[in-house]
Amino acid sequence: MRDDVTQMKWWGWGDEHTEFDASDKPFLMPFITRELGLSEEDEEVVRPVSIEEVKLPGQSLNQDFLDEARSALREDQVKTSDKERLIHSYGKSFRDLWRVRRGIVDSSPDCVVYPESED
Protein backbone atom coordinates (compact mmCIF):
# COMPACT_ATOMS: atom_id res chain seq x y z
CA MET A 1 0.00 0.00 0.00
CA ARG A 2 1.17 3.51 -0.68
CA ASP A 3 2.01 5.68 2.32
CA ASP A 4 -0.25 8.49 1.08
CA VAL A 5 -3.41 6.34 1.14
CA THR A 6 -5.64 7.53 3.96
CA GLN A 7 -7.92 5.42 6.12
CA MET A 8 -11.59 5.34 5.17
CA LYS A 9 -14.32 5.93 7.73
CA TRP A 10 -15.66 2.80 9.41
CA TRP A 11 -19.07 4.46 9.77
CA GLY A 12 -19.47 6.36 6.49
CA TRP A 13 -18.01 7.40 3.16
CA GLY A 14 -14.60 8.88 2.48
CA ASP A 15 -11.48 9.72 4.45
CA GLU A 16 -11.89 9.49 8.22
CA HIS A 17 -10.30 12.91 8.71
CA THR A 18 -12.67 14.71 6.32
CA GLU A 19 -16.13 15.94 7.26
CA PHE A 20 -18.81 17.68 5.26
CA ASP A 21 -19.34 21.20 6.62
CA ALA A 22 -22.85 22.39 5.87
CA SER A 23 -22.59 25.54 8.01
CA ASP A 24 -22.15 27.69 4.91
CA LYS A 25 -25.05 25.96 3.12
CA PRO A 26 -28.14 27.21 5.01
CA PHE A 27 -30.56 25.99 2.33
CA LEU A 28 -29.21 22.43 2.09
CA MET A 29 -31.20 20.77 4.91
CA PRO A 30 -34.47 22.54 4.05
CA PHE A 31 -33.99 21.39 0.44
CA ILE A 32 -33.29 17.79 1.45
CA THR A 33 -36.19 17.81 3.92
CA ARG A 34 -38.58 19.16 1.28
CA GLU A 35 -37.40 16.86 -1.54
CA LEU A 36 -37.56 13.73 0.61
CA GLY A 37 -40.85 14.68 2.23
CA LEU A 38 -39.39 14.70 5.73
CA SER A 39 -40.56 16.62 8.79
CA GLU A 40 -38.41 18.89 10.96
CA GLU A 41 -38.03 16.07 13.50
CA ASP A 42 -36.34 14.00 10.79
CA GLU A 43 -33.53 16.56 10.53
CA GLU A 44 -31.90 15.30 13.73
CA VAL A 45 -28.32 14.21 13.11
CA VAL A 46 -27.73 10.69 14.36
CA ARG A 47 -24.11 10.07 15.30
CA PRO A 48 -22.60 6.60 15.06
CA VAL A 49 -21.89 4.61 18.20
CA SER A 50 -18.29 4.83 19.33
CA ILE A 51 -15.93 2.33 17.76
CA GLU A 52 -15.37 0.86 21.24
CA GLU A 53 -19.07 -0.06 21.43
CA VAL A 54 -18.95 -2.17 18.26
CA LYS A 55 -18.60 -5.88 19.00
CA LEU A 56 -17.12 -7.88 16.14
CA PRO A 57 -17.64 -11.60 15.75
CA GLY A 58 -14.61 -13.61 16.84
CA GLN A 59 -11.78 -14.28 14.44
CA SER A 60 -11.12 -17.72 13.05
CA LEU A 61 -7.64 -17.32 11.66
CA ASN A 62 -5.87 -20.08 9.81
CA GLN A 63 -2.37 -19.52 11.16
CA ASP A 64 -0.69 -21.40 8.28
CA PHE A 65 -2.45 -19.14 5.75
CA LEU A 66 -1.60 -16.04 7.75
CA ASP A 67 2.08 -17.02 8.03
CA GLU A 68 2.26 -17.77 4.31
CA ALA A 69 0.54 -14.51 3.37
CA ARG A 70 2.81 -12.49 5.64
CA SER A 71 5.93 -14.15 4.23
CA ALA A 72 4.85 -13.53 0.62
CA LEU A 73 3.58 -9.97 1.10
CA ARG A 74 4.74 -6.82 2.83
CA GLU A 75 3.72 -6.29 6.44
CA ASP A 76 1.34 -3.45 5.57
CA GLN A 77 -0.61 -5.68 3.15
CA VAL A 78 -1.95 -8.15 5.74
CA LYS A 79 -4.09 -6.67 8.53
CA THR A 80 -5.92 -8.41 11.36
CA SER A 81 -6.84 -5.48 13.63
CA ASP A 82 -10.42 -5.00 14.73
CA LYS A 83 -10.55 -1.59 13.01
CA GLU A 84 -9.45 -3.06 9.65
CA ARG A 85 -11.94 -5.90 10.05
CA LEU A 86 -14.72 -3.43 10.90
CA ILE A 87 -13.97 -1.17 7.92
CA HIS A 88 -14.29 -4.19 5.62
CA SER A 89 -17.32 -5.77 7.33
CA TYR A 90 -19.86 -4.00 5.16
CA GLY A 91 -20.18 -2.06 1.95
CA LYS A 92 -21.25 1.57 1.84
CA SER A 93 -24.91 1.18 0.90
CA PHE A 94 -27.53 2.96 3.01
CA ARG A 95 -28.55 -0.32 4.69
CA ASP A 96 -24.96 -1.25 5.50
CA LEU A 97 -24.15 2.17 6.93
CA TRP A 98 -27.38 2.23 8.97
CA ARG A 99 -26.39 -1.06 10.59
CA VAL A 100 -22.72 -0.33 11.24
CA ARG A 101 -23.46 3.17 12.62
CA ARG A 102 -25.61 1.44 15.25
CA GLY A 103 -22.93 -1.13 16.02
CA ILE A 104 -24.73 -4.02 14.32
CA VAL A 105 -22.03 -6.22 12.81
CA ASP A 106 -23.11 -9.80 12.15
CA SER A 107 -20.02 -10.89 10.25
CA SER A 108 -16.57 -9.56 9.50
CA PRO A 109 -13.47 -10.83 7.75
CA ASP A 110 -10.84 -12.62 9.79
CA CYS A 111 -8.12 -10.65 8.05
CA VAL A 112 -7.79 -8.08 5.28
CA VAL A 113 -5.25 -8.49 2.48
CA TYR A 114 -4.38 -5.42 0.43
CA PRO A 115 -2.96 -5.48 -3.11
CA GLU A 116 0.52 -4.13 -3.68
CA SER A 117 -0.90 -1.23 -5.68
CA GLU A 118 -4.13 0.03 -7.20
CA ASP A 119 -2.65 -0.05 -10.71
Model-derived features: positions:
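Noncatalytic alpha-helical scaffold of FAD-dependent oxidoreductases
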Residues: 1-119
